[in-house]
Amino acid sequence: MNQSYGRLVSRAAIAATAMASLLLLIKIFAWWYTGSVSILAALVDSLVDIGASLTNLLVVRYSLQPADDNHSFGHGKAESLAALAQSMFISGSALFLFLTGIQHLISPTPMIDPGVGVIVTIVALICTIILVSFQRWVVRRTQSQAVRADMLHYQSDVMMNGAILLALGLSWYGWHRADALFALGIGIYILYSALRMGYEAVQSLLDRALPDEERQEIIDIVTSWPGVSGAHDLRTRQSGPTRFIQIHLEMEDSLPLVQAHMVADQVEQAILRRFPGSDVIIHQDPCSVVPREGKRSMLS
C-alpha cells in the first residue's frame, strides 16, 4: 500500500508544482501588461501554490519512510505538519491580497487591455480544473491529508479565477473598483480556506479519532464475529495513510486461550480487509472481569 500511496501522492505534488509554475509565468506577464490587482492576487496565490506543492512533495517522501528506533509509529504526522504550514502560507497571502485590495479600492487604477487578462484567466481556470480533478482522484485512492489540503487550495483557485473573470468583465465596462472589490472577496475566501485547513491539520496532530462512520464499521465487524460477546474501549487515530485501531474484545470465560487468540486474529484480519494498511491492536478480556459500568463508550 505504501508504495502505491507514495507514487500517487508524489505524482499529485509534482503535477501541482508544474502547473503552478506554468501559471505563474503566464500571470506575471498578464499582470505586467494589464496592471490588474485581481491578476496580482492570482499571481501571489500561484507563488504560494508552488511553495506549498514543493513542501508537499518533500514532506510526503519523508512521511513514507519506515518506522525506526526513534519513530516507532512511523513518520506519517509529517503530512499534518505540511498541511499546517500550508495554512500559514495561505493566510499570509490572503492578508497581502486584502491590503492590496483596500489600497486599490481607495485609489482605483484603470486596466490596460483587460482582454489579455480574460484570456489568461480562462487558461488558468481550465488548467486548475484539470489539476483539481486529478487531485480529487488521488485523494479518493489515498486519503492523503497533504494532497487534500493542496486540493482545497486549488479549489479556492477555481473560485478565484471565476471571480477574476467577472471583475475583469466589469472593469472592461468602466467599473474599475470591481477589480479591487473582488480582490478583497478573494482574500477573505482564501483566509477562510486556510483556517479550515489549519484546523484539520491541528486535529490530526492532536490524534482526533476516526470519523464516526468508520468507528461504527469497526464496531459492527467486531460485535458480529462468532466467539465475541462484546467489545469496549475502542481507540482510533490516523497518521498519514495509516489508521491506528485499538479495541478490547469480550469473550466467554470458558474459551481456551489458544481459541481466543485465533478469534482475535480473525477479527484483526477482518478489520484489515476493510481498512488496508491499518495498525490494529486487539486485547481479549474474559466477560467476568469486564464491569459494565466501567466501560468507556466506543464512540466517545
UniProtKB/Swiss-Prot annotation:
Keyword Lipid biosynthesis: no
Record GO terms (molecular function): cadmium ion transmembrane transporter activity; ferrous iron transmembrane transporter activity; metal ion binding; zinc efflux antiporter activity
Subcellular localization, as worded in the UniProt entry: Cell inner membrane
A Gene Ontology BP annotation from the UniProt entry: intracellular zinc ion homeostasis
GO cellular component terms given for this protein: plasma membrane
Keyword line: Cell inner membrane, Cell membrane, Ion transport, Iron, Iron transport, Membrane, Metal-binding, Transmembrane, Transmembrane helix, Transport, Zinc, Zinc transport
Record membrane topology: Multi-pass membrane protein
TM helices/strands, residue ranges: 12-32, 39-59, 82-102, 114-134, 156-176, 178-198
Catalytic function, reaction form: Zn(2+)(in) + H(+)(out) = Zn(2+)(out) + H(+)(in); Cd(2+)(in) + H(+)(out) = Cd(2+)(out) + H(+)(in); Fe(2+)(in) + H(+)(out) = Fe(2+)(out) + H(+)(in)
InterPro entries reported in the protein's UniProt record: Cation_efflux, Cation_efflux_CTD, Cation_efflux_CTD_sf, Cation_efflux_FieF, Cation_efflux_TMD_sf, CDF_Transporter
Gene3D superfamilies linked: Cation efflux protein transmembrane domain, Cation efflux protein, cytoplasmic domain
Family of this protein: Belongs to the cation diffusion facilitator (CDF) transporter (TC 2.A.4) family. FieF subfamily.
Function: Divalent metal cation transporter which exports Zn(2+), Cd(2+) and possibly Fe(2+). May be involved in zinc and iron detoxification by efflux.
Subunit structure: Homodimer.
Protein name per the record: Cation-efflux pump FieF
Record organism: Shigella boydii serotype 18 (strain CDC 3083-94 / BS512)
